[in-house]
Amino acid sequence: MDSSEGCTDMDEPSPGFILNMTSDAKVRSVVEQIDRLSNITTSPPEMGWYDLEFDPLEDEGPFLPFSAYVITGTAGAGKSTSVSALHQNLNCLITGATVVAAQNLSRALKSYCPTIYHAFGFKSRHINICQRKVPKVTQSSIEQLQRYELARYWPTVTDIIREFMRKKQKGQYSSLSQSAFRLLCRMGGANLWTSNIIVIDEAGTLSSHILTAVVFFYWFYNSWLDTPLYRNGAVPCIVCVGSPTQTDAFQSVFNHTQQRNEISACDNVLTFLLGKREVADYIRLDENWALFINNKRCTDPQFGHLLKTLEYNLDISPELMDYIDRFVVPKSKILDPLEYAGWTRLFISHQEVKSFLATLHTCLSSNKDAVSTKLFTCPVVCEVFTEPFEEYKRAVGLTHMTPIEWVTKNLFRLSNYSQFADQDMAVVGTYITDASTQITFATKFVKNSYATLTGKTKKCICGFHGSYQRFKSILDGELFIESHSHDNPAYVYSFLSTLLYNAMYSFYAHGVKQGHEEFLRDLRELPVSQELISEMSSEDVLGQEGDTDAFYLTASLPPSPTHAALPTLVAYYSGAKELFCNRLALARRHFGDEFLHSDFSTFTVNIVVRDGVDFVSTSPGLHGLVAYASTIDTYIIQGYTFLPVRFGRPGGQRLSEDLRRKMPSIVVQDSSGFIACLENNVTKMTETLEGGDVFNICCAGDYGISSNLAMTIVKAQGVSLSRVAISFGNHRNIRASLVYVGVSRAIDARYLVMDSNPLKLMDRGDAQSPSSKYIIKALCNPKTTLIY
């Protein structure tokens, strides 16, 4: 008897899967401990002290109690993904320290996760509010530390609470019972006033005062609204997740007189919790710290040993030095755009990124025959408003500064994640009026190159490009419908119906091109579902000439989602999908399996692509399915369009009519093959001086995307890259955190190269890795939780 009979072959589980399963029991214990911390209660602090007249620099308010749990570990060890266990088992507010971290969590949890800044009410106008320089005095208690941290951030805090008091009614939840409050928590998303468990991913990138700000806003909001959390004295539990050795926190103060940023290192939230003895004792760090040990992103044992060496600041063995030498290639190969095509270059400085992109664009522009990697330019417009700019110049004593000089010195501040600092762009024109000065830059993009978003951006999905088989797989899987139907499913079914309606012609066109009369005859004879039939009877179609697709003589246009009921839209979509699949099966029978993999495109309107990048149409505008684009997904740049795109904003376009005429919408393709237009990014630059004077100086319009061809190591944090080429350049005394972040982006050690051995250039010692000694101490402490 065959021993395999009745057995099912199973794939061997991956090392990453095994590592995740072995950590399951310890993760459960972490959840239980955080649950216990969240049940701690106290006498509610009297928040009436903290009014708009209060100033912690001069006044002493009541101490705001809190608890904390720290989750740290090597890069790729599963810290962020383990947050899903908290999300599934506890009522908690999940946040990220950055937009990338928040979007990463949102995708993993399939639930909206804000940044911690958004959670406590931070707005764009607060970016340029200067932090106060608080005199440093000896802080010997947790109360003194909290007061000091709160005083640093108080100008921003007061502006946020002023707006909150204006928008929220005092005592709004005073009459709400405990059961009604629990129902409210389940109905809506988590907030600082619906949960006392606040999770912050990538907390090591936050300045230490943000921890105190979160604690303050938790108590203030719950006190103002008079929630059951406040009445019961529920102490907030702040869960801080991150890797203290791969992150640094910096604070920047803009010097208006010299027009430059003054950047200095500061304590981050993790080192604040680990390194401040008063804080560590208060939160009982030994019992409330979990360390993830093994890297699950890249499971190569030697690579994991490298990360642990950097994590714990261990001595570098000759064997490890030899291992890193295997990744070293000549610097000229990494800087040559023709080498390592498709790999992501990582650099230390923005100038190095910009130089590489400029070299790449020069190579592409000299190759006129390259269609798939065509280089094209789009304008970026900065508009400086004359009146507030003149007032600002007088206030800072720079009366001779011109708008162009100001824009040149402030480009890096005009867009998220220093997009302007990385772009290969140059001034191509200025337009001066009495009201403003418009400065136009030309920025370059490469067709079919990968890019990520630099902020929260709307997209209008307007088409699909790929193969017939790929499109059919998407329709059969219905994942697209599931992932986009949470707001209004009617629009999703209407969108797909429009794509299907317009896609039918491709079968007829292929038959005509091939001169295949039998296929065209069979195509006409395919039955059309009753849900698609227009008011014109089938008899009216008989006798029509065969020079057009009979489907369009028979079928009605897809019903509008604003006028048709959902069942009608679903019925039309089902009928259109059935007919598309029948036509595809017919084409496969006549033309063979290769037809399934042939080129296929469909759009919501008739589109023609000129010069390979310019999407044009005779339609007055471009419509589609509007959604927010994910900042962690990678998009392929396809080109641009000057067609007016409807992004679903009731107030109209975010750009002025003048800027809209100058700036097109960038067209991209996602990993599934769907084509979308991205809404242009609008940045309003507001300068806030120390005295509180505010000047609305500038408005800039750009495209909100950043090339994945090259980026800084700092920007790459939190991103997994399939192919990585790192250039450490001519830098010396490289920070250990930069080396750690750079090499740990790789998901496969076989696809990692670098231009030098960073271990020979890296600063060593406790000063460079201050948290390593605390981590090593924790590894030897039986009270801490180790997760392998």
Swiss-Prot record:
Pfam families found in the cross-reference section: Herpes_Helicase (PF02689)
Binding site for ATP: 73-80
InterPro entries reported for this sequence: DNA_helicase_dom, HSV_HELI, P-loop_NTPase
EC number: 3.6.4.-
EC class (word): hydrolase
Alphabetized HAMAP family for the sequence: HSV_HELI (MF_04030)
Protein's recorded name: DNA replication helicase
